[in-house]
Amino acid sequence: MVGLKPSDVPPTMAVKFLGAGTAACFADLVTFPLDTAKVRLQIQGENQAVQTARLVQYRGVLGTILTMVRTEGPCSPYNGLVAGLQRQMSFASIRIGLYDSVKQVYTPKGADNSSLTTRILAGCTTGAMAVTCAQPTDVVKVRFQASIHLGPSRSDRKYSGTMDAYRTIAREEGVRGLWKGTLPNIMRNAIVNCAEVVTYDILKEKLLDYHLLTDNFPCHFVSAFGAGFCATVVASPVDVVKTRYMNSPPGQYFSPLDCMIKMVAQEGPTAFYKGFTPSFLRLGSWNVVMFVTYEQLKRALMKVQMLRESPF
């Protein structure tokens, strides 16, 4: 990322991986209820949810969370958290931790700065690579977030836990079931990574170049918030298709394209922006928490590295 002084020790690959994964997990802990609310709003209106929808209707972000707490218990907004943390450790560490390295690969030799095209290519590449590794965890996370359990009984729960979900999906739908929705997810995360990481990179660079802010919390906050807004605007349509397709039972949709066509036919084009508000609240707050934490972790780990190399 931009903003490091020449005298600073550049972070190693291990520092970037650990810092990005840890910061993303912390951000998930803070914002996970917003993500769950987004998933519930995105799948509301599907054919398979009609019967349940007669009992439960979600209205707005806060209303969705309060309805879940009232009907399913206080822990329900955190359904799928374990899979979510597994996802971030394997996902964010790649898409964010590898971004600088891939950007350097695409940057022509002798160039002082990376162009916008170079940054977009790097964002698309690391986003797609991350999905390849983390897709099963994303499928399980979405299944848990989408499942509705009315009452305290566990008898209506399809999965008893995260590991049981992996086993059950593989047994009932085949190993391919764990990779369901990989194509729309690659599209979604390539777009999100470009809008998120590239926007953060450019905003931070410009704020520092024009001396509007120093390389500290306010700069990181503004850059991260702008990145979250851009990511939400461009990724919401793909995100809705991804969520519905991954949550669907076998046979409901033939492909992500079929899912998209049925959405337009049954609910109109506005269905692509269902759950936009929680998506923005979640991505905006997630980006702020993640990037601020990531910058501080990198700074702390680099100081430790400098002390090790020159203890006196």
UniProtKB/Swiss-Prot annotation:
<dbReference type="GO" id="GO:0007584">
    <property type="term" value="P:response to nutrient"/>
</dbReference>
<dbReference type="GO" id="GO:1990542">
    <property type="term" value="P:mitochondrial transmembrane transport"/>
</dbReference>
<keyword id="KW-0812">Transmembrane</keyword>
<feature type="transmembrane region" description="Helical; Name=1">
    <location>
        <begin position="11"/>
        <end position="32"/>
    </location>
</feature>
<feature type="transmembrane region" description="Helical; Name=3">
    <location>
        <begin position="120"/>
        <end position="136"/>
    </location>
</feature>
<dbReference type="GO" id="GO:0009409">
    <property type="term" value="P:response to cold"/>
</dbReference>
<feature type="topological domain" description="Mitochondrial intermembrane">
    <location>
        <begin position="201"/>
        <end position="217"/>
    </location>
</feature>
<dbReference type="GO" id="GO:0032870">
    <property type="term" value="P:cellular response to hormone stimulus"/>
</dbReference>
<feature type="topological domain" description="Mitochondrial intermembrane">
    <location>
        <begin position="295"/>
        <end position="312"/>
    </location>
</feature>
<keyword id="KW-0496">Mitochondrion</keyword>
<dbReference type="GO" id="GO:0006631">
    <property type="term" value="P:fatty acid metabolic process"/>
</dbReference>
<dbReference type="GO" id="GO:0014823">
    <property type="term" value="P:response to activity"/>
</dbReference>
<comment type="similarity">
    <text>Belongs to the mitochondrial carrier (TC 2.A.29) family.</text>
</comment>
<feature type="topological domain" description="Mitochondrial matrix">
    <location>
        <begin position="238"/>
        <end position="271"/>
    </location>
</feature>
<feature type="transmembrane region" description="Helical; Name=2">
    <location>
        <begin position="77"/>
        <end position="99"/>
    </location>
</feature>
<feature type="region of interest" description="Purine nucleotide binding">
    <location>
        <begin position="279"/>
        <end position="301"/>
    </location>
</feature>
<dbReference type="GO" id="GO:1901557">
    <property type="term" value="P:response to fenofibrate"/>
</dbReference>
<feature type="repeat" description="Solcar 1">
    <location>
        <begin position="11"/>
        <end position="105"/>
    </location>
</feature>
<keyword id="KW-0472">Membrane</keyword>
<dbReference type="GO" id="GO:0007585">
    <property type="term" value="P:respiratory gaseous exchange by respiratory system"/>
</dbReference>
<dbReference type="GO" id="GO:0006629">
    <property type="term" value="P:lipid metabolic process"/>
</dbReference>
<dbReference type="GO" id="GO:0005739">
    <property type="term" value="C:mitochondrion"/>
</dbReference>
<feature type="topological domain" description="Mitochondrial matrix">
    <location>
        <begin position="33"/>
        <end position="76"/>
    </location>
</feature>
<dbReference type="GO" id="GO:0051384">
    <property type="term" value="P:response to glucocorticoid"/>
</dbReference>
<feature type="repeat" description="Solcar 3">
    <location>
        <begin position="215"/>
        <end position="300"/>
    </location>
</feature>
<dbReference type="GO" id="GO:0015078">
    <property type="term" value="F:proton transmembrane transporter activity"/>
</dbReference>
<dbReference type="GO" id="GO:0032868">
    <property type="term" value="P:response to insulin"/>
</dbReference>
<keyword id="KW-0677">Repeat</keyword>
<dbReference type="GO" id="GO:1990845">
    <property type="term" value="P:adaptive thermogenesis"/>
</dbReference>
<keyword id="KW-1133">Transmembrane helix</keyword>
<dbReference type="GO" id="GO:0001666">
    <property type="term" value="P:response to hypoxia"/>
</dbReference>
<feature type="topological domain" description="Mitochondrial intermembrane">
    <location>
        <begin position="1"/>
        <end position="10"/>
    </location>
</feature>
<dbReference type="GO" id="GO:0005743">
    <property type="term" value="C:mitochondrial inner membrane"/>
</dbReference>
<feature type="transmembrane region" description="Helical; Name=5">
    <location>
        <begin position="218"/>
        <end position="237"/>
    </location>
</feature>
<dbReference type="GO" id="GO:0017077">
    <property type="term" value="F:oxidative phosphorylation uncoupler activity"/>
</dbReference>
<keyword id="KW-0219">Diabetes mellitus</keyword>
<dbReference type="Pfam" id="PF00153">
    <property type="entry name" value="Mito_carr"/>
</dbReference>
<comment type="subunit">
    <text>Interacts with HAX1; the interaction is direct and calcium-dependent.</text>
</comment>
<dbReference type="InterPro" id="IPR002067">
    <property type="entry name" value="Mit_carrier"/>
</dbReference>
<dbReference type="GO" id="GO:1902600">
    <property type="term" value="P:proton transmembrane transport"/>
</dbReference>
<comment type="function">
    <text>Putative transmembrane transporter that plays a role in mitochondrial metabolism via an as yet unclear mechanism. Originally, this mitochondrial protein was thought to act as a proton transmembrane transporter from the mitochondrial intermembrane space into the matrix, causing proton leaks through the inner mitochondrial membrane, thereby uncoupling mitochondrial membrane potential generation from ATP synthesis.</text>
</comment>
<keyword id="KW-0813">Transport</keyword>
